Every structure is written in C-alpha cells, then in structure tokens.
C-alpha cells in the first residue's frame, strides 16, 4: 500500500503537557512515527515523502489567522523579554471576547487546551503531516484503491481555528476536503479512542461529508465538551454527524457492536470514498484506552473496512502504547489487505 511520511514530521518533540490538574510527560512522541514507519517497511509498503501541495488545501479547512499563528507563535514567544520557556503554552483559554492583542491573547484563542505546546519545529512537523494526508488523498483521487497517510502529529481534535488534544492541523478533514474534488460524497469513519470534535465541527453543517465516530463516552473524558449521541449535525448537515460513544470498560465485543452500527451508517450514506481516522489507542494496554481491543481485533477491523471496497485514505491518529504499535499496524493492514490485494 502506498504510504506517505515526511521525516520532518518527527521534529515535533513536546516536553510536557497539562491534563486534569497535572503536568504530565508527553505521550505523543517521535518514536510513535518511527515504530509505524518500521511496520510499513516490514510489510513491504513503499514509503514515500509527500509532495508539497502548499497551504491552500489546508486553508480550505482551517482559518488563515490560525495558520499564521501556528507558523509564527514560537518566534514571538521566544522574543519576549522575559523567559517564557521553550514552548508556547497558554494558561488562559478564552476564544471570545478576545481582542487578540499580543501573543498571549492569540494563544488563548488558538490553543484550546494544555496538550498542544508549540515548539520550534511544531509548525513544520504539522505542515508535513497534513501534506502526507494530502498525498494519500491525491493517490486515491487518482485511482489507487487505498493509501496510508502516516500522520504525526495526529489531527482529528484540531478545530477550524484551534489546536487541541495533541493535534494542530486536521489531517483527516483536509484529506476529506481534497477528495471532494473528485468524489461527490465522502465519509469519515473515526475509530480513535477519543471523539474527533475537530472533524465534527468542520463538517457539522454539511451533507456531502458524513462523519461517524466510535469513541469512549466523553463524560469527564477528552474532549469532554463534544461527542455525545444527540449531536446529529445542523442545517443541511442534520443527520450527517453520527456519534457512537462506548461506556468506559467496554469489551472488544462491545467495540465491534459499535463498528457494526457505523458500517450500517456508511452503507446508508453510500459514499464514493472513505477516510478512516485510525487510532491504535483503543488497544487494551494503551495508556489512553477505556476499551479492550486486542491486536487480533485490529485485524478484524481492517477486514471489515476492506470489505466496504471503497477508495480509502487511512489517516493515522492516536496510539500511545509504543511497544504494540508495530504489531497492531501489521494486524490491521493484514486484515485490510486480505480483501484489497
């Protein structure tokens, strides 16, 4: 399977993040990408560096002021006369009212939580992660049956104008929007442990892109503010946003009950192409997991997705149990490839 990854995606190296009242050691680390690249090579996938599609297809999804913020905030942060640290991190979170005067106010608007420090190379890493998604979308748009965007940093929590949940640019949404150039109806299926509230926000009022998410109950669990089953879309998009939350502690069987529900929604929508937001953080030993999916379970998931026989862009999202990433990737792609050739 065609796989896209740029070495600069590994340049983002966060030092810490803030969650639930504590400063914590980062989980979204460069080694995640290294393990997944190794798995791709072991499976015989051609791993290619993406072309540079420029900023325009990213700006088709994200606010241009936000993109400028991501590109410049670290330089402005380091230029402050006081020592504000090596990473831009906000301790103020106010979208509105916000005059956006000064870098601290801009960070208050554009960093939605404490999990997205912006270091010297964060923008470059996020930019090339998005370019990997665009390259995979271009390959599928041009006739490849499937392509893998090995995205890191991940993306599905990134909002139109704000970073959050380890995510800066919404790779899956960028890929889905790019697919719309050829495909009238695009579905995004999200199987990450956490609800992709960024994807939901971007497509919430649209009927040409269906978003279906299987995730842990967001009550007191990231993203906490969205991902509930009564969020169905708005305006023309009413009915085209489907959330399938799982109780914490769910079994693998319960996970696949939600997968069956999601597949029914996809078949009802009858998309021309699919974007899969693939998270390995539903693995039973993942530090973020609240369900019990096994390595073999990822093979079953791949088999079910492959059985749809849709042009498919697979976009990497979470997965933080470093030791299991290669095995889980091999299992998923083995199941997917068993039907796709």
UniProtKB/Swiss-Prot annotation:
Q: Which molecular function GO terms apply here?
A: acetylputrescine deacetylase activity; histone deacetylase activity; metal ion binding
Residues annotated as the enzyme's active site: 157 (proton donor/acceptor)
Q: Does the keyword Metal-binding apply?
A: yes
Q: Which CDD domains match?
A: HDAC_classII_APAH
Question: EC number(s) for this protein?
Answer: 3.5.1.-, 3.5.1.62
Note the subunit structure: Homodimer.
This protein's name: Acetylpolyamine amidohydrolase
The organism that produces this protein has a lineage beginning with: Bacteria, Pseudomonadati, Pseudomonadota, Betaproteobacteria, Burkholderiales
């Amino acid at each position: 399977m065609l796989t896209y990854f740029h070495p600069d995606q590994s340049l983002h190296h966060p030092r810490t993040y803030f969650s639930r009242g504590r400063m914590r050691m980062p989980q979204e680390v460069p080694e995640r990408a290294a393990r997944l690249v190794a798995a791709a090579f072991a499976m015989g996938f051609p791993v290619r560096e993406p072309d540079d599609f420029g900023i325009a297809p990213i700006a088709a999804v994200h606010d241009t002021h936000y993109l400028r913020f991501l590109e410049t905030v670290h330089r402005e942060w380091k230029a402050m006369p006081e020592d504000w640290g090596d990473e831009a991190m906000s301790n103020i979170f106010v979208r509105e009212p916000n005059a956006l005067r000064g870098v601290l106010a801009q960070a208050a608007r554009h960093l939605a939580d404490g999990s997205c420090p912006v270091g010297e190379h964060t923008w470059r890493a996020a930019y090339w992660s998005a370019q990997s998604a665009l390259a995979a979308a271009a390959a599928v748009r041009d006739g490849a049956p499937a392509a893998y965007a090995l995205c890191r940093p991940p993306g599905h929590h990134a909002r139109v104008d704000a970073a959050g949940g380890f995510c800066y640019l919404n790779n899956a949404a960028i890929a889905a929007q790019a697919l719309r150039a050829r495909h009238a109806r695009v579905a995004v299926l999200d199987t990450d442990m956490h609800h992709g509230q960024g994807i939901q926000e971007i497509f919430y009022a649209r009927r040409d892109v269906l978003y279906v998410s299987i995730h842990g109950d967001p009550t007191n669990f990231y993203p906490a503010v969205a991902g509930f089953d009564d969020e169905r879309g708005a305006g023309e998009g009413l009915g085209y946003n489907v959330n399938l939350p799982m109780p914490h502690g769910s079994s693998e069987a319960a996970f696949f009950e939600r997968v069956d529900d999601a597949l029914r929604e996809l078949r009802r929508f009858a998309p021309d192409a699919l974007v899969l937001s693939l998270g390995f953080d539903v693995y039973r030993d993942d530090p973020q997991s609240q369900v019990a999916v096994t390595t073999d379970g990822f093979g079953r998931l791949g088999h079910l997705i492959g059985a749809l026989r849709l042009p498919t862009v697979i976009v990497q999202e979470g997965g933080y149990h470093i030791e299991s990433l290669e095995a889980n990737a091999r299992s998923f792609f083995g199941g997917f490839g068993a039907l796709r050739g």
